[in-house]
Protein backbone atom coordinates (compact mmCIF):
# COMPACT_ATOMS: atom_id res chain seq x y z
CA UNK A 1 0.00 0.00 0.00
CA UNK A 2 1.44 3.44 -0.91
CA UNK A 3 2.49 5.70 1.95
CA UNK A 4 0.03 8.41 0.88
CA UNK A 5 -2.88 5.96 1.19
CA UNK A 6 -1.73 4.87 4.64
CA UNK A 7 -1.47 8.46 5.82
CA UNK A 8 -4.81 9.54 4.36
CA UNK A 9 -6.88 7.67 6.92
CA UNK A 10 -4.29 7.15 9.60
CA UNK A 11 -4.21 8.66 13.05
CA UNK A 12 -1.04 10.49 13.99
CA UNK A 13 0.11 7.62 16.20
CA UNK A 14 -0.12 5.17 13.30
CA UNK A 15 1.71 7.60 11.02
CA UNK A 16 4.55 7.74 13.54
CA UNK A 17 4.73 3.95 13.58
CA UNK A 18 5.01 3.87 9.78
CA UNK A 19 7.91 6.33 9.98
CA UNK A 20 9.61 4.32 12.72
CA UNK A 21 9.42 1.15 10.60
CA UNK A 22 10.86 2.99 7.59
CA UNK A 23 13.81 4.21 9.67
CA UNK A 24 14.46 0.72 10.97
CA UNK A 25 14.61 -0.71 7.44
CA UNK A 26 16.85 2.13 6.27
CA UNK A 27 19.32 1.52 9.11
CA UNK A 28 19.52 -2.16 8.23
CA UNK A 29 20.41 -1.32 4.62
CA UNK A 30 23.00 1.38 5.33
CA UNK A 31 25.15 0.92 8.41
CA UNK A 32 27.35 3.90 7.52
CA UNK A 33 24.50 6.41 7.84
CA UNK A 34 22.96 5.22 11.09
CA UNK A 35 23.81 8.44 12.94
CA UNK A 36 21.27 10.72 11.24
CA UNK A 37 18.64 7.98 11.28
CA UNK A 38 19.22 7.27 14.99
CA UNK A 39 18.73 10.97 15.65
CA UNK A 40 15.46 11.05 13.76
CA UNK A 41 14.26 7.90 15.52
CA UNK A 42 15.09 9.43 18.92
CA UNK A 43 13.03 12.51 18.03
CA UNK A 44 10.08 10.29 17.09
CA UNK A 45 10.33 8.51 20.44
CA UNK A 46 10.35 11.89 22.18
CA UNK A 47 7.25 13.29 20.49
CA UNK A 48 5.17 10.08 20.55
CA UNK A 49 3.40 10.81 23.90
CA UNK A 50 2.46 14.29 22.69
CA UNK A 51 1.17 12.99 19.36
CA UNK A 52 -0.94 10.41 21.20
CA UNK A 53 -2.46 13.21 23.27
CA UNK A 54 -3.21 15.28 20.16
CA UNK A 55 -4.97 12.25 18.65
CA UNK A 56 -7.13 11.89 21.74
CA UNK A 57 -8.06 15.58 21.90
CA UNK A 58 -8.92 15.68 18.20
CA UNK A 59 -11.61 13.07 18.90
CA UNK A 60 -12.99 14.64 22.09
CA UNK A 61 -12.90 18.39 21.40
CA UNK A 62 -15.41 19.72 18.91
CA UNK A 63 -14.10 22.01 16.16
CA UNK A 64 -10.50 21.22 17.08
CA UNK A 65 -7.77 22.72 14.89
CA UNK A 66 -7.91 20.09 12.16
CA UNK A 67 -5.40 21.98 10.03
CA UNK A 68 -2.69 21.48 12.66
CA UNK A 69 -3.29 17.73 12.66
CA UNK A 70 -3.31 17.54 8.86
CA UNK A 71 -0.05 19.51 8.72
CA UNK A 72 1.56 17.06 11.13
CA UNK A 73 0.38 14.12 9.04
CA UNK A 74 1.84 15.74 5.94
CA UNK A 75 5.16 16.27 7.72
CA UNK A 76 5.30 12.61 8.79
CA UNK A 77 4.40 11.49 5.26
CA UNK A 78 7.26 13.57 3.90
CA UNK A 79 9.61 12.05 6.47
CA UNK A 80 8.72 8.51 5.40
CA UNK A 81 9.34 9.35 1.73
CA UNK A 82 12.72 10.91 2.51
CA UNK A 83 13.88 8.00 4.66
CA UNK A 84 12.84 5.40 2.08
CA UNK A 85 14.52 7.30 -0.77
CA UNK A 86 17.65 7.78 1.33
CA UNK A 87 17.87 4.05 2.00
CA UNK A 88 17.66 3.24 -1.72
CA UNK A 89 20.64 5.41 -2.68
CA UNK A 90 23.83 3.63 -3.60
CA UNK A 91 26.95 4.18 -1.54
CA UNK A 92 28.81 5.82 -4.41
CA UNK A 93 26.13 8.44 -4.96
CA UNK A 94 27.68 10.81 -2.44
CA UNK A 95 26.11 14.01 -3.79
CA UNK A 96 22.53 12.74 -3.50
CA UNK A 97 23.29 11.22 -0.11
CA UNK A 98 24.52 14.60 1.10
CA UNK A 99 21.36 16.33 -0.18
CA UNK A 100 19.03 13.78 1.38
CA UNK A 101 20.97 13.87 4.63
CA UNK A 102 20.58 17.65 4.80
CA UNK A 103 16.83 17.41 4.10
CA UNK A 104 16.42 14.75 6.78
CA UNK A 105 18.20 17.02 9.27
CA UNK A 106 15.83 19.88 8.43
CA UNK A 107 12.83 17.60 8.76
CA UNK A 108 14.09 16.27 12.10
CA UNK A 109 14.30 19.87 13.35
CA UNK A 110 10.70 20.42 12.24
CA UNK A 111 9.58 17.33 14.15
CA UNK A 112 11.37 18.57 17.27
CA UNK A 113 9.34 21.75 16.93
CA UNK A 114 6.25 19.61 17.52
CA UNK A 115 7.24 19.38 21.17
CA UNK A 116 6.42 23.07 21.45
CA UNK A 117 2.87 22.26 20.36
CA UNK A 118 2.46 20.89 23.91
CA UNK A 119 1.52 24.44 24.92
CA UNK A 120 -1.28 24.49 22.37
CA UNK A 121 -2.49 21.05 23.46
CA UNK A 122 -2.80 22.27 27.05
CA UNK A 123 -4.83 25.24 25.80
CA UNK A 124 -7.22 22.81 24.08
CA UNK A 125 -7.68 21.01 27.39
CA UNK A 126 -8.28 24.33 29.19
CA UNK A 127 -10.89 25.29 26.59
CA UNK A 128 -12.62 21.92 26.91
CA UNK A 129 -12.84 22.24 30.70
CA UNK A 130 -14.03 25.85 30.43
CA UNK A 131 -16.76 24.89 27.97
CA UNK A 132 -18.05 22.28 30.42
CA UNK A 133 -18.10 24.82 33.27
CA UNK A 134 -19.83 27.45 31.13
CA UNK A 135 -22.50 24.94 30.13
CA UNK A 136 -23.18 24.16 33.78
CA UNK A 137 -23.30 27.85 34.62
CA UNK A 138 -25.73 28.61 31.80
CA UNK A 139 -28.07 25.96 33.18
CA UNK A 140 -27.98 27.58 36.61
CA UNK A 141 -28.55 31.03 35.11
CA UNK A 142 -31.61 29.76 33.28
CA UNK A 143 -33.01 28.47 36.56
CA UNK A 144 -32.36 31.82 38.24
CA UNK A 145 -33.88 33.97 35.52
CA UNK A 146 -37.04 31.84 35.54
CA UNK A 147 -37.64 32.70 39.19
CA UNK A 148 -40.01 35.58 40.19
CA UNK A 149 -38.35 38.99 40.48
CA UNK A 150 -40.08 39.97 43.73
CA UNK A 151 -37.25 40.83 46.16
CA UNK A 152 -35.07 37.80 45.35
CA UNK A 153 -31.57 37.84 46.77
CA UNK A 154 -29.22 35.00 45.82
CA UNK A 155 -25.53 34.54 46.46
CA UNK A 156 -23.42 31.46 45.94
CA UNK A 157 -19.69 30.87 46.17
CA UNK A 158 -18.24 27.71 44.80
CA UNK A 159 -14.67 26.56 44.35
CA UNK A 160 -13.75 23.34 42.65
CA UNK A 161 -10.60 21.81 41.37
CA UNK A 162 -10.09 19.07 38.86
CA UNK A 163 -6.84 17.35 37.89
CA UNK A 164 -5.70 14.66 35.48
CA UNK A 165 -2.42 12.78 34.97
CA UNK A 166 -1.39 15.06 32.11
CA UNK A 167 -3.19 18.37 32.63
CA UNK A 168 -4.56 20.14 35.69
CA UNK A 169 -7.07 22.90 35.28
CA UNK A 170 -8.09 24.41 38.57
CA UNK A 171 -10.97 26.72 39.08
CA UNK A 172 -9.69 28.75 42.01
CA UNK A 173 -12.57 31.10 42.33
CA UNK A 174 -16.03 31.21 40.87
CA UNK A 175 -18.70 33.48 42.18
CA UNK A 176 -22.21 34.03 40.96
CA UNK A 177 -24.04 36.97 42.47
CA UNK A 178 -27.52 38.22 41.83
CA UNK A 179 -28.40 41.56 43.32
CA UNK A 180 -32.02 42.53 43.07
CA UNK A 181 -33.22 46.01 43.83
CA UNK A 182 -36.87 45.83 44.81
CA UNK A 183 -38.72 48.56 43.07
CA UNK A 184 -42.26 49.31 42.09
CA UNK A 185 -41.61 48.84 38.37
CA UNK A 186 -40.58 45.17 38.87
CA UNK A 187 -37.02 45.52 37.50
CA UNK A 188 -35.12 42.30 36.64
CA UNK A 189 -32.12 41.11 38.65
CA UNK A 190 -28.54 42.07 37.75
CA UNK A 191 -26.18 39.08 37.32
CA UNK A 192 -22.43 39.54 37.74
CA UNK A 193 -20.35 36.51 36.64
CA UNK A 194 -16.64 36.26 37.38
CA UNK A 195 -14.66 33.14 36.37
CA UNK A 196 -11.02 32.71 37.38
CA UNK A 197 -8.96 29.58 36.69
CA UNK A 198 -5.32 28.58 36.45
CA UNK A 199 -3.19 25.82 34.96
CA UNK A 200 -0.73 24.36 37.45
CA UNK A 201 1.42 22.81 34.72
CA UNK A 202 1.92 26.10 32.83
CA UNK A 203 1.50 28.40 35.84
CA UNK A 204 -0.91 30.67 33.97
CA UNK A 205 -3.94 32.48 35.32
CA UNK A 206 -6.95 33.37 33.22
CA UNK A 207 -10.25 35.02 34.00
CA UNK A 208 -13.51 36.04 32.35
CA UNK A 209 -16.07 38.49 33.71
CA UNK A 210 -19.34 39.67 32.25
CA UNK A 211 -22.58 41.24 33.51
CA UNK A 212 -26.13 40.40 32.49
CA UNK A 213 -28.93 42.84 33.17
Curated annotation (Swiss-Prot):
The keyword Transmembrane applies. Residues 1-153 form the RPW8 domain. One of its GO terms (cellular component) is membrane. Induction: Expressed in leaves after powdery mildew infection (e.g. Erysiphe cichoracearum UCSC1). Its main location: membrane. Belongs to the plant RPW8 protein family. This is RPW8-like protein 3.
Amino acid sequence: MPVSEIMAGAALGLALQVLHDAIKKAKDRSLTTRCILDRLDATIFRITPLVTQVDKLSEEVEDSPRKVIEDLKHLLEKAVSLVEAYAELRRRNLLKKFRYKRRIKELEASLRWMVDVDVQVNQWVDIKELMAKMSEMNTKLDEITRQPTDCICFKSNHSTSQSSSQNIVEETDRSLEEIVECSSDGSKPKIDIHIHWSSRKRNKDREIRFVLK
